[in-house]
């Protein structure tokens, strides 16, 4: 197992303290049924949640920022059901938002599937990508499965190196 520790604070407090700022959380979205606030199965909630986050990103960095200076972290564990539903959601929303080739990273290829800190694994990896411009490839694949939706996604085992200032989201 693993542990992730992230300190979140108000913008003014961070500036007053002279804290190094790695990113910001402009909003949080969830759309799930039941008592456990996670997505229990494929459905419209997945699309709604991700579309809201993408719309927020677009409102902050503009259409070009979202279309040309963003990437996405896949969360699905590589199981047939997850790879199909997750790739379908990402691909369809990339198309909807006018993204032609959205780079996809999946940190689980390097860390495995941690339980509680899985979101923290992805958060810290994303912060590193924004700082250094290095989008990790998915090292555990040598080709895409036939059932992966990828007409608007760039999914591969090769790392993508970009200048750090070329990534907004």
Write out the residue ranges for each language-model feature.
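Conserved catalytic cysteine-centered active-site region
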Residues: 1, 90-121
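Stable alpha-helical structural segments in soluble proteins, enriched in small hydrophobic residues
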Residues: 49-62, 89, 93, 122, ...
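A general structural signal for well-ordered alpha-helical packing
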Residues: 22, 47-51, 69, 86-91, ...
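Short helix-capping and hinge/turn segments at secondary-structure transitions, especially at repeat
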Residues: 55-59, 74, 78, 95, ...
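Condensing-enzyme catalytic core mediating Claisen C-C bond formation in acyl metabolism
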Residues: 1-65, 70-71
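Beta-strand segments within the central parallel beta-sheet cores of soluble alpha/beta enzyme folds
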Residues: 20-28, 63-74, 101-109, 137-147, ...
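Conserved beta-strand-centric core segments of catalytic alpha/beta enzyme folds
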Residues: 1-13, 116-169
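Short glycine/threonine-rich loop-to-helix capping motif typified by GTGT followed
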Residues: 34-46, 76-93, 114-122, 154
